[in-house]
């Protein structure tokens, strides 16, 4: 069989199982109201939790950064590509998100995927046992695999099982890895207990706060700040293309950890540094997130979350008990989930259908992502659409 034939057969199998993914093309900036594939829609698909992606101040900051630093970085961070914008952002991030450890330092990455791979592969290896939550993000899973550590998966948020696994381990180095907010369920990891176990067993606790940074905690400083945790065992990873509205990611930890990443993290060392203008814009975003406007946006978002929770409970399907901006509604079968998403789309509502392998088989769902850019009228539209579909399904 020709190589292309093998791929064609594989794609047919994906189609037969209702699992083909398709990209959609946005013709306008990321916002609550967009033009996608030439049609006006209300979007419930993005991770723009604070509605900052099209904020005029950030657009201006991107332009200012490009004028000041140019279109590209020109090299890796260690070979000419580390600009003043990158350095300033790392200082800003350490101050904003590093309150959980003394002598905090931050390291800026081009993507959250790279930050997760870099951290796990630099800190874990042969002789390390890595304890990973069963529902961790794909980038954490891949980082664990690439680290060559012994990887043990503990049941989702089950700290009793994790405790037993730690007790049974004689590894030289132990690393606990977890999302803070789980991206497909919206629930929050038991961070205080995870840190307690990490300190009890002399382990690192690495948390991916991709969906918590900017939204949770005082001034949006993240899930660790919300839980009021402090420890040199903690390492926090956050993304800057979600609530922050721009792009990139960062790791915050004790300065010694960050210096180790600079020296040993291959995804940091062997890649061109991100566009300096983006770093300049993220610094502007942090000022919004941590200020009065950020507080107001989070308060509005919380109102939307509470209303959506009540709305989903009134449907014939299974809502996940999420108190975050990620509001899943489990439908079950792939085809049924796709049909509901398509019906909502025809009504001008973009609510993505999430299917295996992203979520377990039999738990295909609508993933409703809320943003401070949404209005109550937007939720009126969503509620009406779900009510009509629910009446047909009942």
Swiss-Prot record:
Organism whose genome encodes this protein: Paraburkholderia phytofirmans (strain DSM 17436 / LMG 22146 / PsJN)
Taxonomic lineage of the native organism: Bacteria, Pseudomonadati, Pseudomonadota, Betaproteobacteria, Burkholderiales
Summary of subunit composition and partner proteins: Homodimer.
InterPro entries membership: Aminotransferase_I/II_large, AON_synthase_class-II, AONS_Archaea/Proteobacteria, AONS_Proteobacteria, PyrdxlP-dep_Trfase, PyrdxlP-dep_Trfase_major, PyrdxlP-dep_Trfase_small
GO MF assignments: 8-amino-7-oxononanoate synthase activity; pyridoxal phosphate binding
Family the UniProt entry places it in: Belongs to the class-II pyridoxal-phosphate-dependent aminotransferase family. BioF subfamily.
Residue positions, PTM N6-(pyridoxal phosphate)lysine: 242
Named cofactor requirement(s): pyridoxal 5'-phosphate
Function comment: Catalyzes the decarboxylative condensation of pimeloyl-[acyl-carrier protein] and L-alanine to produce 8-amino-7-oxononanoate (AON), [acyl-carrier protein], and carbon dioxide.
Pathway recorded for this protein: Cofactor biosynthesis; biotin biosynthesis
Keyword hit for Signal: no
Residues annotated to bind pyridoxal 5'-phosphate: 112-113, 183, 211, 239
PANTHER family to which the protein is assigned, alphabetical: 8-AMINO-7-OXONONANOATE SYNTHASE, CLASS II AMINOTRANSFERASE/8-AMINO-7-OXONONANOATE SYNTHASE
Pfam families: Aminotran_1_2
Binding site for substrate: 21, 137, 358
Catalytic activity: 6-carboxyhexanoyl-[ACP] + L-alanine + H(+) = (8S)-8-amino-7-oxononanoate + holo-[ACP] + CO2
Protein known as: 8-amino-7-oxononanoate synthase
EC number(s) reported in the record: 2.3.1.47
Alphabetized UniProt keyword annotations: Biotin biosynthesis, Pyridoxal phosphate, Transferase
Enzyme class of the recorded protein, top EC level: transferase
